[in-house]
């Protein structure tokens, strides 16, 4: 199964890159306590995550219940997230996460265009109890994933998706989910406005 989360890796300048990414989990690698021991990452060539892990084969994978933070990480605008030093590796942990898995690469296949990396968990942080995701959080996640492909998806398709997901926000969102939803809508409007002024191509 693929679990959506946020990855921190170390840039060349020593600062952390924060990026949303799915981790592939084999259920046989989940311990009796529910914690991971291994997982797989598949970053694309050209991404900052690909570069960082090829240069420094370690990082931290986070599970979140903060829909806005996940959206910002996916859309490359999470630079103001609160970080604290990792304990085992040279890197950083997102303070506002539920679980943080410090890892080192155990096996690596850098075949392009997408690497296949097996990560071994070397330290687990249980920052708070996991309460689960509600329908509004899933709505933010779905629109966010779509927004990462805004250059290839028509505005009309986005408007249909927004219309479909909006009731979930109205019925089940708390403050964080509403903030995440508003952030993605503002991100899209900004992209489309720049497209009209010649800053982007738009479908």
Language-model features: locations:
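Basic, polyanion-binding surface patches
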Residues: 1-100, 104-203
């Amino acid at each position: 199964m693929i679990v959506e989360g946020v990855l921190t890796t170390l840039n060349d300048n020593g600062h952390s890159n924060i990026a949303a990414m799915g981790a592939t989990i084999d259920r046989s690698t989940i311990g009796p306590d529910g914690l991971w021991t291994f997982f797989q990452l598949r970053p694309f060539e050209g991404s900052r995550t690909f570069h960082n892990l090829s240069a420094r084969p370690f990082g931290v994978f986070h599970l979140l219940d903060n829909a806005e933070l996940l959206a910002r990480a996916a859309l490359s605008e999470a630079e103001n997230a609160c970080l604290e030093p990792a304990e085992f590796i040279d890197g950083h942990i997102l303070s506002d996460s539920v679980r943080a898995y410090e890892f080192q690469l155990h096996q690596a296949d850098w075949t392009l265009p997408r690497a296949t990396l097996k990560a071994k968990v070397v330290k687990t942080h249980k920052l708070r109890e996991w309460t689960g995701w509600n329908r509004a959080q899933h709505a933010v996640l779905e629109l966010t994933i779509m927004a990462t492909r805004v250059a290839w998806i028509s505005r009309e398709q986005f408007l249909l998706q927004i219309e479909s997901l909006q009731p979930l926000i109205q019925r089940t969102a708390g403050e964080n989910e509403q903030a995440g939803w508003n952030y993605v809508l503002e991100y899209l409007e900004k992209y489309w406005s720049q497209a009209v002024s010649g800053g982007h191509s738009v479908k």
